[in-house]
Amino acid sequence: MVQERHPQRKGVCWTLRLWSTAVISMLLLSTCFIASCMVTYQFTMEKPNRRLSELHTYHSSLTCCSKGTMVSEKLWGCCPNHWKSFGSSCYLISTKENFWSISEQNYIHMGAHLVVINTETEQNYIIHQLNESLSYFLGLSDPQGNSKWQWIDNTPYPNNIKFWHPHEPNLPEEWCASIVYWNPSKWGWNDVFCDSKHNSICETKKIYL
């Protein structure tokens, strides 16, 4: 009878070891999963939080608008207070005239840049915010004066949409672009001297929360 008990003990001990190993494995997997989620969450939130911190450095308050209908679907897009919100960007229309380079430097210090127009819809939105008696610098220039225009954010110019007035750009000495209202063609782009003073349009990306 004693000899018959040994196989049973071996079987029980093996079963317990297997169960213990399974429990330990599950705990390790759970720990790894939680750690992975924490890393993913931190990675996902780090960039928006950094961007939010940057905006707060330049602006005392933000205006956020929600998207989605259910609480779980809501996504908040934030712009500096008093800026115009459209698509994934925020816009500020300047009330002061300045040189192209100074306007761009001022906007860089605000965490933004002169506007880059990528679509007709964006252009149409912007022109509804403008004064027809004024001219506004864009983030578009020809730094070498060799007809190689480039956007301030390195958006490829040749493949991008263009809204030049007829016969513009027309002078190699005019290295900067503005948007201006002319009859009968209405709003369009014009090349101007960079050291002439114009109003300007500022753009920055929304921060999503």
From Swiss-Prot:
Alpha-D-mannopyranose binds at E168, P169, N170, E174, W182, N190, D191. It comes from Rattus norvegicus (Rat). InterPro entries: C-type_lectin-like (IPR001304), C-type_lectin-like/link_sf (IPR016186), C-type_lectin/snaclec_domain (IPR050111), C-type_lectin_CS (IPR018378), CD209-like_CTLD (IPR033989), CTDL_fold (IPR016187). Keywords: Adaptive immunity, Calcium, Cell membrane, Disulfide bond, Glycoprotein, Immunity, Innate immunity, Lectin, Membrane, Metal-binding, Signal-anchor, Transmembrane, Transmembrane helix. Coiled coil: none annotated. One of its GO terms (cellular component) is plasma membrane. Residues 44-209 are extracellular. One of its GO terms (biological process) is positive regulation of canonical NF-kappaB signal transduction. Its main location: membrane. One of its GO terms (molecular function) is pattern recognition receptor activity. Residues 86-203 form the C-type lectin domain. Calcium-dependent lectin that acts as a pattern recognition receptor (PRR) of the innate immune system: specifically recognizes and binds alpha-mannans on C.albicans hypheas. Binding of C.albicans alpha-mannans to this receptor complex leads to phosphorylation of the immunoreceptor tyrosine-based activation motif (ITAM) of FCER1G, triggering activation of SYK, CARD9 and NF-kappa-B, consequently driving maturation of antigen-presenting cells and shaping antigen-specific priming of T-cells toward effector T-helper 1 and T-helper 17 cell subtypes. This is C-type lectin domain family 6 member A. PROSITE patterns: C_TYPE_LECTIN_1, C_TYPE_LECTIN_2. Ca(2+) 1 binds at V116, N118, E122, E203. Ca(2+) 2 binds at E168, N170, E174, N190, D191.
